[in-house]
Structure formats: C-alpha cells, structure tokens
C-alpha cells in the first residue's frame, strides 16, 4: 500500500482490505480482456457485464469504488493514479476512468460504464460513521456525565447528564438504524465565544460529517443541507426563528425521512434521516411559545468561566476526549439498556426547566386576569378576543385557535380553575351561537351546610327552640 492509501482514515483502510480479501485474484488487463464478451467483428462488446468485470478484476479498480451510505454518493477510497481533491467520484474522475477503459479494454460507452460503476459501488457499500463508531474502544472512564461542564462550564446535575446522553444515543441510533424516531434537539444556551458551535462540530467526529448551514425549515432544497451530515447545528436557532409556526418546527423535527429525486435520478426515493439536530443561542428566551409543550427542546445553559478547559485550547485533546465519550456511548448502545426518551420524572423537571427559556405569553396572562374578575357563568373565544385582549376587529381562525389553546391547556394544567369546556354551542347576545367554556358548580361543603350550636349560644342569639 502506498502513502496515499496510508493517509486514508484507519476504518476506511480496514474496510478496503476486507473487500479486497474477498475478491478473486487480480489479473492483468491483457488477461482480463481475454475473458470479456466480444463482438462479431472481434472487438470488445460495450456491455455492462464487460465493464463490471473490469471494475471487479483490474487491480487498479479492485476495492476502489464504494457507495457511501451516509452521503449516498460513490467514493473512490484508494489512489487511482491521478491527482484528486476529494473522496467523492467527480466528473473529472469519470473522464480519467473512461480514458483508461478505452485505452486498455476498448470500452467506450459512457452510459454502460456509469451503470457498472453504480453496481460495483453498491456491492461494496460502506458507512464511514458506523465504521468509525465500531472502531472505538472505551477506556472505562466516564465522560458523558461531565463533558458539558468540562468544556462549557454547564452544571453537572442529572438533567444535564441525561440530556447529553439522550442526544448521543439518538445520534448513534440514527446512524445504525436510519429513520429511527428521534425528535429531540439539545440546545446550548450562552454567550458568544463559549465554544457551543465548536462542541457540536467536534462532536461530529470529522468536519465533513458536520453542518451549520440550516437556515430555513421550509427550503425546498433542505434535503441538500441534511444529506451526508450526522450532526447538524441550528446556529443561533435561526431556522426555528424563521419558521412560520411552532407546528412547522415540530413537524420538521419529527420527520423521519425526506422524499426527493436527486439530479440524474429518474424516480424520487425515500431518504431515511441519519442526522440529529443541535441548537446554539445566546438568547435566554429562545424557546418558541408552545402551550402544548416543548418536549423536543433540551436547553442547557453554559458558563464558560466555569469550564475546566476551553474546547479550542487544545483541539487534539478535545477530539480525543470526545472520541472516548462516543466509545462510552457505544458501550451503552451495545448493551441495549437505553431509551430514546426521558423518564416521567425527568420530563416533569424538563417542563419546569423550560419555563426559564420561554418567551413571555402575554395573551395567556391577559386572559387569566380577565377570568379572575369576570362574574359571568360562561365565555367564548370571540368574547375573550374582544374583552380580554382588547381587540375591536373580528378574530382570524388562527387567533381563535390560539385562545382555545390557552383556555384548554390552562384548564388541563390547573392554571384556570372552576371552568370547563362545553360541547354544544350556546347562544350569546353579542356573539351569536358559540362553543366556549362555563363555570363548574362549586362542590357543596360536607354535610348539610349547618353547624350545631349550644343552648347558651342560642340564648345569646335569641333563637327560640
């Protein structure tokens, strides 16, 4: 193996060696040409089979073409004799391949060559992140529990540990079982220069497996931002801030696949998600107001002044630490003793913890205050829109839904007491027939409501018996 091969990642070198060991003995171009199917005129037939035979037997190509299951592109994983700047098969690589096949085998059909390349690459598929994770050996030292404090000064409480552990397990699961349901985003909150983005970049293992280019969730080419990446940072939570609604954010994070057709493909295909999303922000109130719950977001505040080391003080040491953290996570993954969700107790903590990061819900507060002073026995959404929120115009549908959400979640959560929704519309003098909410009859006190008094108390009150 030459120096170019030695420069490849160790896990890729091993994969190439395993592939080559399972192949037939190498032959010279002259020997291979004698085995190819010919034409009636004595030439070499331009067929997919002949091209495939060359790619499988020629020592230059053996083990060189592999389908990368992360990027879904074909990689050239060993030197082929010309200068290259990337691993991925390019148009220039195709030119060199066509030239070689023409000069050595008389194969000149570009279409047949391309088909053969796809077949041989698919038969030699590999997944670089899986190879990387499987190659790690844990040294037995616990790091997941302390990593966010070590690099970013975060707390060392159980929540911080469980949040990072859940994120790591989701990332591993998405790689080994693409499309797995995982809709959680670890969100690092703190000032500029704390190392939040660097943490996610180094967490990806290799820079090419990381991306921070996701700016809009409704971009028609959003799949291009996801393809080929494992850890995707939503920098400053720009993508969620640009979302049209909380429902769009929830839908995006919950998605398990993208369906699209890449250039040169005839049919669209389902691309199962292999990535996870991390968020960074310096805003304390970054969480979108969602009265039905924000369980998808796991905020962790960082305090760089408390960190044991800054993550960029020694990048090599930081990468080594994180690599061992992945090795620890792989030990947990292999044991099967993990869940891709919080316990009920941790979810209760999360719900309370998230309040510190939510935008103020002024509308809910105004409605709560209105109900405290209201003496009527029923209300409807239009009434609340006008009288509680002070609007003079008619509410849009989405505004009505927002009011219903405030009322129903407030009642369910115990914030609004003494009210219940009624099913059949009731008529309001000012608002017409409307669904809404009515007061619940207060439970009478125990007994008959009377209190026994003594004869002396009765005489004092001049009550005859």
Q: Residue locations for each model-derived region?
A:
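Conserved AAA+/SF3 P-loop NTPase catalytic/coupling segment centered on the Walker-B
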Residues: 231-253, 288-293
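Positively charged interface segments
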Residues: 217, 265, 291, 304-320, ...
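AAA+/SF3 P-loop NTPase mechanochemical coupling elements
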Residues: 222-227, 262-280
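Phosphate-sensing "switch" segment of ASCE/P-loop ATPases
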Residues: 271-275, 290-369, 373
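N-terminal nucleic-acid engagement/recognition segments and initiation subdomains in replication
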Residues: 1-142, 158, 162, 393-398, ...
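Conserved nucleotide-binding/hydrolysis micro-motifs of P-loop NTPases
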Residues: 238-239, 282-286, 303-308
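P-loop NTPase catalytic core of nucleic-acid-dependent motor ATPases
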Residues: 117-227, 231, 382
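Conserved catalytic/switch belt of AAA+ P-loop NTPases
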Residues: 246-269
